[in-house]
UniProtKB/Swiss-Prot annotation:
Keywords: Antiport, Chloroplast, Hydrogen ion transport, Ion transport, Membrane, Plastid, Plastid inner membrane, Potassium, Potassium transport, Transmembrane, Transmembrane helix, Transport. PANTHER family: CHLOROPLAST ENVELOPE MEMBRANE PROTEIN, CHLOROPLAST ENVELOPE MEMBRANE PROTEIN-RELATED. It comes from the Eukaryota. GO terms for biological process: potassium ion transport. It holds the Pfam family CemA. Belongs to the CemA family. It catalyses: K(+)(in) + H(+)(out) = K(+)(out) + H(+)(in). It comes from Nicotiana tomentosiformis. The keyword Membrane applies. The gene is cemA. This is Potassium/proton antiporter CemA.
């Protein structure tokens, strides 16, 4: 009975690692055909923001210029002019199809992430007892570590999150999350988030050291500052 109780939190921990991926994959597959059919049938215009409109317009202008340049090096004839118009028409249809797929992708991924968040939130609430056990195990493990190991771990974590080379990692992570939700890539938004998050984390971390760590383990703070210097 005791072994069963000990394995239950471990099983719960494993489920936390693999369950989000499985739920995301399953929900995505279940919603894909429904969202595609709903969008193509309703021909809705939602989720087409200014960034998407600008992107589509830029692609169309670029396409028109390339086709026009291609015709400039040829002899002007009625046949060529007709082919030029047909080429623009075909490529325009292709651009519209791509944009339509992007809209479906946005709705699908956004809906999938919302549903997954709701399911995982409910799963976490139902497994509150297992989370409490895992938390006690983690606290006991950290308590048994030496101050030197703790200081090294804190220093490594802070360097990864708010160190000199961290902006590139933040850019990749935020870009991945941005893409996962189906949003159109925007360098300005991602750059703003990358320049903001590390500063906020750095402020929170310094407050945590000043407020709690100094009181709980002054020796750990001394070792940390020595290693950091």
């Amino acid at each position: 009975m005791a072994k069963k109780k000990a394995f239950t939190p471990l099983f719960y921990l494993a489920s936390i690692v693999f369950l989000p991926w499985w739920i995301s994959f399953s929900v995505n597959k279940c919603l894909e055909s429904w969202v595609t059919n709903w969008w193509n049938t309703g021909q809705s215009e939602i989720f087409l923001n200014n960034i998407q409109e600008k992107s589509l317009l830029e692609k169309f202008i670029e396409l028109e210029e390339l086709l026009f340049l291609d015709e400039m090096v040829k002899e002007y004839s009625e046949t060529h002019l007709e082919e030029f118009g047909i080429g623009i028409h075909k490529e325009t249809i292709q651009l519209i199809k791509i944009q339509n797929e992007n809209r479906i992708h946005t709705i699908l991924h956004f809906s999938t992430n919302i549903i997954c968040f709701i399911i995982l939130s409910g799963y976490s609430i139902l497994g509150n007892e297992n989370l409490a056990i895992l938390n006690s195990w983690a606290q006991e493990f950290l308590y048994n570590l030496s101050d030197t190991v703790k200081a090294f771990s804190i220093l490594l974590l802070t360097d990864l999150c708010i160190g000199f080379h961290s902006p590139h990692g933040w850019e990749l992570m935020i870009g991945s999350i941005y893409k996962d939700f189906g949003f159109v890539h925007s360098d300005q938004i991602i750059s703003g988030l990358v320049s903001t998050f590390p500063v906020i984390l750095d402020t929170i971390f310094k407050y945590w050291i000043f407020r709690y760590l100094n009181r709980l383990s002054p020796s750990l703070v001394v070792i940390y500052h020595s290693m950091n210097d």
